[in-house]
Curated annotation (Swiss-Prot):
Residues 54-63 have a biased composition (Basic and acidic residues). The keyword Membrane does not apply. Disulfide bonds: none annotated. Plays a role in virion morphogenesis, and is ejected from the infecting particle into the bacterial cell. This is Protein 6.7. It holds the Pfam family T7-like_gp67. Keywords: Virion. It comes from Escherichia phage T7. It is found in: Virion. The keyword Cell membrane does not apply. GO terms for cellular component: T=7 icosahedral viral capsid. Residues 1-88 are annotated as: Disordered. InterPro entries: Phage_T7-like_6.7. It comes from the Viruses.
């Protein structure tokens, strides 16, 4: 059996194909706003944005659990022993 590597596609006349008309605009475009609504830009005051305005509270509970926990080391050794036929 012989299979052709090229897939046969029907030939289309490009003169008969027309582009779709774009949807009509409901309003005339007056300007482009970047960064949100115009209500936010009209506020007065000293707002700090970016890295300087970012406040992050540190959670020490994760660091304490890692420092005080030798449970993972014990767990690994028990798994290793059980894999080689030893007791837990």
């Amino acid at each position: 059996m012989c299979f052709s590597p090229k897939i046969k596609t029907p030939k289309m006349d490009t003169n008969q194909i027309r582009a779709v008309e774009p949807a009509p605009l409901t309003q005339e475009v007056s300007s482009v706003e970047f960064g949100g609504s115009s209500d936010e830009t009209d506020t007065e005051g000293t707002e700090v944005s970016g890295r300087k305005g970012l406040k992050v509270e540190r959670d020490d509970s994760v660091a304490k659990s890692k420092a005080s926990g030798n449970g993972s080391a014990r767990m690994k050794s028990s798994i290793r022993k059980s894999a080689f036929g030893g007791k837990k």
